[in-house]
Regions:
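Short, flexible, mixed-charge glycine/proline-rich loop motifs
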Residues: 11-20, 33-38
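Short cysteine-rich clusters marking metal-coordination/redox-active sites
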Residues: 24-27, 36, 44
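Canonical phosphoinositide-binding patch of PH/PH-like domains
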Residues: 206-218
Length: 219
């Protein structure tokens, strides 16, 4: 704690030691040693890297190496993981998958941005476009040519009765848009090499097409 005075170091340790702050606010990893001085959350090193990508929302500092002044320590004391969670995670849809520390960076970044940057869960109904029987999530899809798995946004719409997926995170038009009633999905852990592997088969132009996907959690 270079340069810090003893009183603020002591106060910082007291806040840090609270049970609510002993797990990363974003992925649940034990013993976080970073914190956001603007959001007031205690986070792990890995999630602090994601926070650093959204500097307009979050300023991260090491709890061990950086100096925290009295006002910043007071801010952490007034916020902390429990209070901040009550605000930013107030209304998470039941189908929303909350990543943990074993999940990949892509999933965690999506979660962190949804939570703090887009504030999707602060108010009831903010997720309205998705509420209408629509499930959205990231699945790892095998590329047709090189066989490599890449994360892709998938959308399942009950109202429209179709499954769509997008090659780009912010794409407006889906790469495919298939009617659910022509889809056949089977679990194929061996074929795909993942316990949560799924083969989606559908008909297009009278030809059978296959998509191979998996999700890390199996949800
Ligand atoms: Zn974390």
């Amino acid at each position: 704690m270079a340069g810090g005075n003893e009183r603020s170091i002591k106060a910082l340790k007291e806040v840090w030691r609270r049970a609510e702050n002993s797990f990363c606010a974003d992925c649940g990893k034990p013993d976080p040693d970073w914190a956001s001085s603007t959001l007031g959350v205690f986070i792990c090193l890995s999630c602090s890297g994601i926070h650093r990508n959204i500097p307009s929302i979050s300023k991260v500092k090491s709890l061990k190496m950086d100096h925290w002044d009295d006002a910043q320590v007071q801010f952490l004391a007034n916020h902390g993981n429990a209070v901040t969670k009550a605000t930013y995670e107030a209304h998470i849809p039941i189908y929303y998958y909350q990543p943990n520390y074993s999940d990949c960076q892509v999933l965690r970044e999506q979660w962190i941005r949804a939570k703090y940057e887009r504030k999707e869960f602060t108010e009831l109904g903010k997720q309205l476009p998705y509420h209408d029987g629509v499930k959205e999530g990231i699945l790892w899809k095998r590329g047709r040519d090189n066989g490599q798995f890449l994360p892709r946004k998938f959308l399942l719409s009950e109202r429209e009765g179709c499954l769509k997926y997008f090659t780009k995170q912010d794409a407006k038009e889906p790469k495919i848009n298939i009617k659910i009633d022509v889809i056949n999905a089977t679990f194929q852990p061996v074929k795909i090499g993942n316990p949560n592997g799924l083969q989606i088969t559908y008909l297009k132009d009278n030809k059978t097409r296959n998509i191979f996907v998996y999700h890390e959690s199996g949800k």
